[in-house]
Amino acid sequence: MAAVGPPQQQVRMAHRQVWAALEVALRVPCLYIIDAIFNSYPDSSQSRFCIVLQIFLRLLGIFVSSIVLILSQRSLFKFYMYSSAFLLAATSVLVNYYASLHIDFYGAYNTSAFGIELLPRKGPSLWMALIVLQLTFGIGYVTLLQIHSIYSQLIILDLLVPVIGLITELPLHIRETLVFTSSLILTLNTVLVLAVKLKWFYYSTRYVYLLVRHMYRIYGLQLLMEDTWKRIRFPDILRVFWLTRVTAQATVLMYILRMANETDSFFISWDDFWDLICNLIISGCDSTLTVLGMSAVISSVAHYLGLGILAFIGSTEEDDRRLGFVAPVLFFILALQTGLSGLRPEERLIRLSRNMCLLLTAVLHFIHGMTDPVLMSLSASHVSSFRRHFPVLFVSACLFILPVLLSYVLWHHYALNTWLFAATAFCVELCLKVIVSLTVYTLFMIDGYYNVLWEKLDNYVYYVRSTGSIIVFIFGVVMFGNGAYTMMFESGSKIRAFMMCLHAYFNIYLQAKNGWKTFMNRRTAVKKINSLPEIKGSRLQEINDVCAICYHEFTTSARITPCNHYFHALCLRKWLYIQDTCPMCHQKVYIEDDIKDNSNVSNNNGFTPPNETPEEAVREAAAESDRELNEDDSTDCDDDVQRERNGVIQHTGAAAEEFNDDTD
């Protein structure tokens, strides 16, 4: 079999995309029905039976719409085929009824629907129009239900019988009989088709039930829901639902504005346009489904924004592509936390604008998490191309300027409250992170112009990063207090309390725990280094070797292990932070009271200074060691700094976690 060429692949790809778009479009009406049911309320003035019946019908409508929403593609198409066939049959019956029995039927058409004449009033033109209409209904009915052989012709003839009675001008009671008989035959045929398909429907339902139960037992509920979410393309359905809803509302409002202003111009004034936008935004988040739809639209915008920034700064990290997931989740959490859909229209607009400000700061934090690894990689790899550095520096400058501008605008339009305090704190925190990143970037760039090892570089990086981490931790504690004040005195809710617990755990407890663990590990590593003897001066020149870790020469001093291997103190400290063995021979790095005979192990290149045994070198070096490393002469996560120098940076991606405490 010949291989499929690129044109055929493109055709198949286009065919799949068309079917996928059609599938999404067919699922959208289910969301409209569910949204309409949720936005309608039963009339309390009716009897209890009527109220119970309405509630039952509402639940039944939600259940059926939900089932149709999650149907497979084949089952969904079959459902719409049968539904369309039944709709055509009902329309055909209604047309025959009104055309045959209502004398002023066409006058009713002429006085409705903007006065458009849909059919001619009398004569052969009327008969031909009715015949064509019934033929269209009949052919569509038998095609959708896949009725073959002579039965399809009989059904079409059955639909044309009332029209024939109208053409021959039969008496009214005979025409009534013909319409009733035609409707009865069509109804019986529909019931017969349903009875034939009932067996298929039963086995299909049973198969789906067994399949879902099997998947639930093997993979669990979470994976089952994720698979359904992806299979039905639920984010695309939400986007189409929200965009079509807003478009329909915009069309209606535009028509109302034009009628109110009594103008035929397509354009409207700026004030009317602003009112139109505000009304669309207010109605675009008036229910939980519309909030989900707005979240899906925000997800699409954030996704392409993240891809654009990644392409601009030249990053290829896969974890940085999660902006399209973080932004909508944060927006939806903020909407639930503040009760956005349940507020009055004026309050809803104000609350939505505040939530969007917090969302903007969160997106900027996430973008900083995307930019920082690229910035550190460029500086540590000593890339001197201006075209590689400019995009990252430009994005970093924007990340510093935008929070400042946002804070300036907010402080000039709002009075001080807990929400403004939270937004300002997030902006200041982002500016601080940018300053820390640019400072570390500058230090690494300065180090790139040195030909020797800058041993104090890691200490400076440690001071900068630790200072920034401490300030960020203080911001987290302050924001927790701000959220506690808001929950107790302004607007407390279970969702807010839950989010505060998450904030306290992730941004306060875990951050403090990890910081303390890092400090203790570094302290232990420093103590191990300080227990090793130091060699410097003339003995260092006699070694004539390089450090086995960084491959740089010994210029000022070196530490000697019990196995007589020499390393830079800084390099060995980084190694001991990972494991407690010698990088060369993998023996334990420790000093005992009585140093054992290690004469069988020499230094890095087998050299021993003349007139000196290895034991004497160790004892003399230990006696002459008068400089100890301080506990703060180390970096924040030394292994991370070494990775930065090699251009391999771990992406944190923690911008969204800092907003678990979003307040009013």
From Swiss-Prot:
Cellular component, GO annotation: Derlin-1 retrotranslocation complex
Phosphothreonine PTM sites in chain numbering: T635, T663
In-chain residues carrying the UniProt-annotated modification Phosphoserine: S634
Membrane topology type: Multi-pass membrane protein
Transmembrane segments: 51-71, 85-105, 125-145, 154-174, 178-198, 293-313, 323-343, 356-376, 390-410, 420-440, 469-489, 495-512
Composition skew (Acidic residues), residue ranges: 629-639
Enzyme Commission number(s) of this protein: 2.3.2.27
Chain intervals annotated as zinc finger (RING-type): 547-586
One term of GO molecular function: zinc ion binding
Cell location: Endoplasmic reticulum membrane
Alphabetic keyword roster: Acetylation, Endoplasmic reticulum, Membrane, Metal-binding, Phosphoprotein, Receptor, Transferase, Transmembrane, Transmembrane helix, Ubl conjugation, Ubl conjugation pathway, Zinc, Zinc-finger
PROSITE patterns the UniProt entry points to: ZF_RING_2
Highest rank taxon of the organism: Eukaryota
Name of protein: E3 ubiquitin-protein ligase RNF139
Annotated organism of origin: Pongo abelii
High-level lineage: Eukaryota, Metazoa, Chordata, Craniata, Vertebrata
Gene: RNF139
